[in-house]
């Protein structure tokens, strides 16, 4: 596809009402919306969750920091990359640095922002702010304060691919991050140095 994408009209929000709220973790809204063709949808539901940062972190010798932890939403143990939600007033990069330290005890020498991606376009959900951190080194003990127990693993890229093929990554965001960073073209062209 070249040139400008085709134009699509935006839906007009006529009314919004809160259905459920559990701040800061979850808000469900019902919207009345007018479609470009004139139809009106009386109950379009939106779910809002907090934005988060997720990091693909490589040590100086090229191993990747991976967490093995129970994820109650899927009721299973999964491999994940370090990640976490924003604190009030925090920007994406500050969140990424804080979460890396809290969950692993590591800091990174170099950072690249890989962009902001919405996790569920039809319901909004939240946005994932992705980062590639390199030259990571351990400077402290992990102290995340999270509900989940975490086991920190140092894996090669080949081990990550094998784990993904075996279904050890339960979340699409993790597979997307792995593909984005390791793709021979995208991995070198997406993002900017922070």
Label every model-predicted segment.
Residues 107-114:
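A short coil-to-beta-strand element that immediately follows conserved catalytic motifs
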Residues 18-24, 117-129, 186:
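Acidic pyrophosphate-coordinating catalytic loop
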Residues 29-35, 120-140:
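Active-site-adjacent beta-strand/loop module that shapes the phosphate/pyrophosphate-binding cleft
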């Amino acid at each position: 596809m070249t040139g400008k994408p085709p134009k699509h009209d935006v839906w007009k929000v006529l009314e919004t009402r809160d259905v459920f709220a559990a701040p800061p973790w979850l808000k469900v809204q019902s919207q009345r919306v007018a479609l470009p063709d004139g139809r009106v949808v009386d109950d379009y539901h939106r779910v809002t969750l907090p934005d988060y940062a997720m990091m693909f972190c490589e040590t100086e010798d090229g191993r990747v920091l991976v967490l093995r932890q129970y994820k109650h939403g899927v009721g299973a143990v999964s491999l994940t990359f370090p990640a976490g939600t924003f604190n009030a007033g925090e920007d994406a990069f500050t969140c990424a640095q804080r979460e890396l330290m809290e969950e692993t005890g590591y800091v990174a020498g170099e950072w690249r922002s890989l962009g902001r991606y919405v996790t569920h376009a039809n319901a909004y959900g939240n946005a994932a702010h992705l980062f590639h951190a390199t030259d990571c080194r351990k400077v402290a003990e992990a102290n995340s304060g999270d509900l989940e127990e975490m086991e920190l693993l140092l894996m090669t890229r080949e081990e990550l691919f094998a784990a993904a093929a075996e279904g050890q990554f339960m979340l699409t965001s993790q597979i997307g991050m792995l593909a984005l960073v390791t793709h021979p073209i995208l991995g070198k062209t997406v993002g900017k140095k922070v």
